Amino acid sequence: MADLGTNVRYIKGIGEVRANALEKLGIVTLGDLISYFPRGYEDRTAVRPIRELTAGESVCVRGMVAADPTPRRIAGGRTLVKTRVVDDSGAMDLVFFNAQHLGSSLRMGETYVFFGRVEDDLRRKQMINPLFEPEGRQQVTGRIMPIYPLTAGVTQGLMARAARQGLDACRELLPDVLPDGIRQAHSLCYVNYAYENIHFPSSPEALEVARRRLVFEELFLLTCGLQLLRQRRRDVAGPACHPMDMEPFYRRLPFALTGAQRRAIADAVGDMVSGKPMNRLCQGDVGSGKTMVAAACIWFAVENGWQTALMAPTEILARQHYQGLAPLLARFSIRCALLTGSTRARERREILAGLADGTIDLCIGTHALLTEDVQYQKLGLVVTDEQHRFGVNQRAALSQKAEDPHLLVLSATPIPRTLALVIYGDLDVSVIDELPPGRQKVDTFALGESYRPRVQAFIRKLAAAGQQIFVVCPLVGEPDQIPDERKAVTAYARQLQEQVFPDLRVAVLHGKMKPKEKERVMAAFAAGESDILVSTTVVEVGVDVPNATCMVVENADRFGLSQLHQLRGRVGRGKEKSYCILLSDSRNEETRARLKVMTQTNDGFVISQEDLRLRGPGDFFGQRQHGLPAMKIADLSCDMRLLDEAQTAARQLMAQDPELTEPTHQALRDRIRQLFDTNADMLN
């Protein structure tokens, strides 16, 4: 008796050879097969009279073969078969290449249904290599056909036949994991209907009903699984912290915190005194003051006797954190150290000794914090900055330096809260949704190439006023044609220096530089020793130069909105008016609409939502946590409403049955365990 775990090679009609081909697509079991959903569909339901056909469209035609399909040899040793079909409205030619045995399946005088792309050879309409079936015995014409993602050795025909055989084999095996009450409340179809019509829809309406059910189920299962993970993590003891009044910390700061910063700090401190490990994401717009939330948590941890590790994605950003936090935290006698890949051996040994004996309270660094010889006496808090620049394996490695430390993740990529729950999994979310007083609004302009002389004159005017300018240029072209990053940026900077701004000081920054060289260039720019910094997107994250008042982005159409917003965040950090100029000569309407969004708002959450709508969630999902199930059918660029419905339904169900232990929820719990296989031990 087959079950969903049965290898597809044992399914009737598939066998060893087809199973080996399907395995290339990740299809091993019957469950894999029926969950390998089409990426699109081809509507072959419309049968059109020949007279009404238009060149370029793909349609079905019902006609009688009116000429004997006789093969003949053509140049190159190929075989060509040409015939003609007629219906009540006219005639059309059919052309087949390398189909010398066609005569045995296509007989003159008989009626067939043909599907293909209509061509126009000036004399009459024709189809080249159309699909065809005898009238009344149709399987691939006259219906909506699935289009699957393929790989070498697997055709659409093989995939469709395998899906048909898989569905036939498991018709009685599919448990409906959605509780009846939820299915009925959300007007969802039964599971068998959903799988049948997602693969072989009987109509466009049936396809929509099936997809809605499967998307809801996928998001519902994900939400329930994350809720179970949260509950399991709450069963673990975190580093003990006692409640403390935060006012002594606030009073000694050189500036007042915003209400949003105080709320985020209260969230984090509440986690830390709960007795359970904090797992919190603090997300806020560029310049919203996330670092001060981290500083408050560091102070709170140190006051409770714990050490902290803060890991940044680049040495530039790590050093910047150190330069900002060390003097601030020195007010509270907190001892800080900076540990990066370029730290000298002697200094490194001293830092390692200080971490091991507890004389260093806070260590700020890069991936160097992950090496085996870095050991802490009493690590209680881990802070990671710019989460999207880290693999979660790195974050986990840092957390393993202590048993279940508190974790605070800072992200300047604002995303909708519902989406954050999907991407960051079991992290609780705090949002800093207001900027500190005095933070400048950056005026943004999207301009074409014709404006370049005026932009250059504007840059010269700013430089004459003692202000500085970033110029970001992407690497343009196909991957195998992109010039060496160092050469591309250096050549562009040389052009600016020699031909455009010979009287200004132009510096270069790119990712291929050694850390010390990057540091030297950035330090010189921050000290005002250069007027223009030409860079790749290495300046996207965290670089803080208050005197820089203009960001010019070349070929701005090459970037997503969220990335452009991050680049824009490098300016507007001082007292002077700041500007962002997006240069693009693209005539694409969608591209122009995207860049227009940048000129209309400085709100990172609005921009993020628009980026999600225009480009889909792919950029965000590069950040997804390891161990979360892959999404097979949900598309969060268009399924956000269903996500909201599914999350609400899941929360309501788990408020009634937090562990899903009721007998009616057994199938649901088993399915969640199967999906969260890498975290299954946490769901026991």
Residue locations for each model-derived region?
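OB-fold nucleic-acid-binding modules
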Residues: 36-66
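N-terminal pre-P-loop "Q-motif" helix
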Residues: 255-278, 292
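Long, highly charged, low-complexity intrinsically disordered interaction regions
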Residues: 1-11, 20-23, 221-222, 232
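Upstream accessory/linker segments immediately N-terminal to the RecA-like ATPase cores of bacterial MutS
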Residues: 71-252, 623
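Short, surface-exposed secondary-structure boundary micro-motifs
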Residues: 64, 117-118, 225, 556, ...
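C-terminal accessory region of SF2 helicases/translocases
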Residues: 587-684
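Inter-lobe coupling/hinge segments of SF2-like helicase ATPases
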Residues: 234-237, 277-596, 656-660, 684
